[in-house]
Amino acid sequence: MNLKQIDTIKEKIQPILSEKHLLLWDLSFFGGSPAVLTILIDGQDHQAIRMNQISEVTSLISDALDKVEPDPFPDRYNLDISSPGIDRSIKTDEHLDWALGQPIKLNLFEKIDGSKSAEGILKSFSDLEISLEVSPAEVKNFPREKISKISLNQEA
């Protein structure tokens, strides 16, 4: 699936989510047999969502996607709609902005200070780095190009 198709899907589902006072957290597509379209949704102001909301939105989104032309899914696929969960992945600057002041975990491509991960309170971020308060008196900066994954860390 290409970026244009993903944008088309986002355009189709965004009004549905807005009407139901929900936010799109993430969207991913994995080819396979069958392929899987995963849509992660969250409540406005990042409030918890209920299963009945997920069920209702799944039906509405499925109907909307069935009407997209040209069909982005000519073959069979599974639609998976769920909450991003408490240890949600943080992928965009919007996600980082939301996570400011919260505990996060970084997975790194290579060791920094002897470790391939870091945990702390997200203090700030820029295009180049992410700053974590790793202890009450210590803030460390991590280059974004060395970070493989960022997630909320509710275990902290």
Curated annotation (Swiss-Prot):
Where does the UniProt annotation locate this protein? Cytoplasm
Indicate where this protein is primarily found: cytoplasm
Q: Which domain of life is it from?
A: Bacteria
Q: Name one GO biological process term.
A: ribosomal small subunit assembly
Kindly state one GO CC term assigned in the UniProt record: cytosol
Q: Per its UniProt record, what InterPro entries does this chain match?
A: Ribosome_maturation_RimP, RimP_C, RimP_C_sf, RimP_N, RimP_N_sf
Q: Does the keyword Transferase apply?
A: no
- Per the database entry, which stretches of residues form a coiled coil? none
Keywords assigned by UniProt, alphabetized: Cytoplasm, Ribosome biogenesis
- A Pfam family in this protein? DUF150_C
CDD domains assigned to the protein according to its UniProt record, in alphabetical order: YlxS_C
Record's function text = Required for maturation of 30S ribosomal subunits.
Family statement drawn from the similarity comment of this UniProt entry: Belongs to the RimP family.
Listed name of the protein: Ribosome maturation factor RimP
* Name of encoding gene: rimP
